[in-house]
Amino acid sequence: MENFDIKDKSLAEGGRRRIKWAEREMPVLRSIHERFVKERPFEGIRMSACLHVTTETANLMTTLQAGGADVVLVASNPLSTQDDVAASLVMHNEIPVHAIKGEDNATYYKHINSAIDHKPHITMDDGADVVSTLHKDRRDFLKDVIGGTEETTTGVIRLRAMAADGALAFPVVAVNDAMTKHFFDNRYGTGQSTMDGIIRATNLLIAGKTFVVGGYGWCARGLAMRARGMGANVIVTEIDPLKALEAVMDGFRVMTMVEAAPLGDIFCTLTGDLHVLDKHHFEAMKAVSYTHLRAHETR
């Protein structure tokens, strides 16, 4: 019986080429891979990873496999899955992958449960869906879990709420708190990729537009920097007074979203939270304006 669920196995060769291309830009992970081949630190450990199924994640999975881990990968977001990468991991590395680009909600949670069926010792989450499903619906599998990791702000918020309630049954490392994560991935990676997504989706000229950034955490800082670099007039909205002051000192206009709503041409929120843009904000916007939510939850 095939222990995977992907779109098309014939896409594997193209996926392998793209995975190797991404590896060129990942020298630290490559050096860890080489060390893991010799040390095998995860021998006998089962890992269930719920992450974006991309070329970068593929290199992480093969590195964990090289370290002896028995890994299963499922998608943390159906919209980001790269089907050729999923096929390559299955066909060339024999890593079970359950991920199809554009999968519906039922399939998404079927795949989440496939990750739990693996009886993981360690969970790797991006959005905390495996951990939350374990605690809500599959508690009989908690006994095998010794710990986990959570990559993104949205997931960390969920898990900290569980921990505060005494509901979190095992320790989870908040990867997002690592300086190498938020200083670089959040600020530079998310800043660039968000701008790339906005331009691809809208084909807008950014120069001269009033660009409203909701929040001033590390992701928002990166986007504000990129938008200004492309000639936008950037407004920042931020409820934390210290971060708001920092945005002012960085040279941005700072105001409430109520004040910014009628001024903006493009709105992008990067807070990992709800109600940054609400009905009354949309009602105050220009007749033609563009909104973009940059957060884990897209379903």
Where in this protein do the model-derived segments appear?
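Gly/Ser/Thr-rich loops at beta-strand to alpha-helix junctions
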Residues: 50-57, 77-81, 128-130, 218-219
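Histidine-anchored nucleotide/phosphate-binding helix
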Residues: 54-67
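An anion/phosphate-binding loop that grips the pyrophosphate of nucleotide cofactors and donors
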Residues: 264
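Glycine/serine-rich phosphate-binding loop and adjoining beta1-alpha1 elements at the start
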Residues: 2-32, 42, 76-80, 86-209
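Short internal beta-strands
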Residues: 70-79, 235-237
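Rossmann-fold NAD(P) dinucleotide-binding segment
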Residues: 275-289
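Glycine-rich phosphate/diphosphate-binding loop of Rossmann-like nucleotide-binding domains
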Residues: 54, 192, 199-261
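Conserved small/polar residues in nucleotide/adenosyl-binding loops
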Residues: 291-298
